[in-house]
């Protein structure tokens, strides 16, 4: 799949409590050809993912005024949809926060303020990694059980064993 086709097929959900940050990220990603949706709090994020699963989630760690913070949203979504790639963002992040979010299943962590090039690069890598994981799963399903022998002659048995 070409980079352009991957972008057109990719819908990204952006979750941040600051409208200007949501708009900035959406604008950068739109300019790169991605489709975006936005949510401003944890309830909006969970509802948006459950209604129509995005290909990627860009999630702020500190969701002011929300029932859950970004780490709790990450925990919830990783239980429900473990293969959903999530990129965490924060302006108040520490190395410990970044490591904790990645240990909980985030693909990567971007500290605010960020450069547009970094965001574009991480989003592209996350989508490509998710695509490759899906392809591997599909190939494993097509290949079937690895332990099946093509034949059962003594010559084949000697080669396989």
Can you say where each PLM-predicted feature lies in the sequence?
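Non-catalytic signal-transmission and effector/linker regions of two-component phosphorelay proteins
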Residues: 1-13
